[in-house]
């Protein structure tokens, strides 16, 4: 029971619903892979204790025991091969160099494997999600940036071969985006996207700026895991469903039928609306999808508070100072401030494919490292 509590606590180092600044940002000193596996360090001590209780591991964690043994063998092989670097035979030294490179690569892979085995996944990692984007500080420039970020995530969903369905879309007069939401579904969609929530800041010269000055604008991303039917049951008696005429773009359909749907969850006051589709039935279905995600996210936050007495995760004021990532167009770079990682070629990054995926993978790895450090510190 104790181990379950410890492992559960480690999960919350990074919030399930990353809709604002991280509860505590990943420090620049978050341990890299080699630091975690330093001989004599807490992780090594932990692994040695685990390997020392083979009978227990054979029953409970056979896969972990196998990887620990393989890591020890590979490290022993590396040490033995390194001695050959001082051999008088040049051909033997070159052969040793090649063997060392291959061995180091295998050791790195084994260490990553151990981290994945030690850090438990969240129950929501396999869930689909609701993406919400909202323009923040910066007027029309913020709305233009919001539109670009929404497009970036739509392209990322295509890159990952996920399903992407727009639920809401409220454009601005000049081609920007005030607010939009979408349902994203696919293999480990929430696991990949959960660290995208927060305030995104852009620094660039707006198209309307005649003096060439760099402006700073912001927008907010919210990521909400979608519940399954088992996760959340809603009593129909707790809902008030209103219909109204749609407004905004839509041609002759606008203001002619009561297709827009507004659903209120009476016990909590949570509201969900949708007027994206021409069909009232379809809009009701989409509004319910959003409502379920919001209620499920509230439930998860309550669980966090019960376990850790943590403050609620909030979107915040969308101010310029609350940021998880900066997109600097004059310098052609994007920087994630939680892990102090900078990538160049911003144009490619905004296309939502391999560069964004690289940053997502880095965030996942650092989150796993911090969770592992928390687990080890409480178990050693």
From Swiss-Prot:
Transit peptide, residue positions per record: 1-26
Main location: mitochondrion
Tissue: Expressed in skeletal muscle (at protein level).
GO cellular component, one term: mitochondrial matrix
Renumbered residue ranges of the record's region GGQ domain: 236-300
Coiled coil: 63-117
Motif (GGQ): 250-252
Subcellular location: Mitochondrion
PROSITE patterns, alphabetized: RF_PROK_I
GO molecular function, one term: translation release factor activity, codon specific
Residues with N5-methylglutamine modification: 252
Domain of life the protein comes from: Eukaryota
Biological process according to GO: mitochondrial translational termination
Keywords, comma-separated and alphabetical: Coiled coil, Methylation, Mitochondrion, Protein biosynthesis, Transit peptide
Modified how: Methylation of glutamine in the GGQ triplet by HEMK1 is conserved from bacteria to mammals.
Comment on protein domains: The GGQ domain interacts with the peptidyltransferase center (PTC) of the large ribosomal subunit to trigger nascent chain hydrolysis.
Family according to the record: Belongs to the prokaryotic/mitochondrial release factor family.
Function: Mitochondrial peptide chain release factor that directs the termination of translation in response to the peptide chain termination codons UAA and UAG.
Classification via PANTHER family: LD18447P, PEPTIDE CHAIN RELEASE FACTOR 1-LIKE, MITOCHONDRIAL
Entry protein name: Peptide chain release factor 1-like, mitochondrial
Source species: Homo sapiens
Record gene name: MTRF1L
């Amino acid at each position: 029971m104790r181990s379950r509590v410890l492992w559960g606590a480690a999960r919350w180092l990074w919030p399930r619903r990353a809709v604002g600044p991280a509860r505590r940002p990943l420090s620049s000193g978050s341990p890299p892979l080699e630091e975690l596996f330093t001989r004599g360090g807490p992780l090594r001590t932990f692994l040695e204790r685990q390997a020392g209780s083979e009978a227990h591991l054979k029953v409970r964690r056979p896969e972990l025991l196998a990887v620990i043994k393989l890591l020890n063998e590979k490290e022993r092989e590396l040490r033995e091969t390194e001695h050959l670097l001082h051999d008088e035979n040049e051909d033997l030294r070159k052969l040793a160099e090649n063997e060392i490179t291959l061995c180091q690569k295998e050791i790195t892979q084994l260490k990553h494997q151990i981290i994945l085995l030690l850090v438990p996944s969240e129950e929501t990692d396999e869930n689909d999600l609701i993406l919400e984007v909202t323009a923040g500080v910066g007027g029309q420039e913020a709305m233009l940036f919001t539109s670009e970020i929404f497009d970036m995530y739509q392209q990322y969903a295509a890159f990952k071969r996920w399903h992407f369905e727009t639920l809401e879309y409220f454009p601005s007069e000049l081609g920007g985006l005030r607010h939009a939401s979408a349902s994203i579904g696919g293999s480990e969609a929430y696991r990949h996207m959960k660290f995208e929530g927060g305030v995104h800041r852009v620094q660039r010269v707006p198209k309307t700026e005649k003096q060439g000055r760099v402006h700073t604008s912001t927008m907010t991303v919210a990521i909400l895991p979608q519940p399954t039917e088992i996760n959340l049951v809603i009593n129909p008696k707790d809902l008030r469903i209103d219909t109204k005429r749609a407004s905004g773009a839509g041609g002759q359909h606008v203001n002619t039928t009561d297709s827009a749907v507004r659903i209120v969850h009476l016990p909590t006051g949570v509201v969900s609306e949708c007027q994206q589709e021409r069909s009232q039935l379809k809009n009701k279905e989409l509004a319910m999808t959003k409502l379920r995600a919001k209620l499920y996210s509230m439930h998860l936050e309550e669980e966090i508070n019960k376990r850790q007495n943590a403050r609620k995760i909030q979107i915040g004021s969308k101010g310029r100072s609350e940021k998880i990532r900066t997109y600097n167009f004059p310098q052609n770079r994007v920087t994630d401030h939680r892990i102090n990682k900078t990538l160049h070629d911003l144009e490619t990054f905004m296309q939502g494919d391999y560069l964004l995926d690289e940053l997502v993978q880095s965030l996942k790895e650092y989150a796993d490292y911090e969770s592992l450090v928390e687990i080890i510190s409480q178990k050693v």
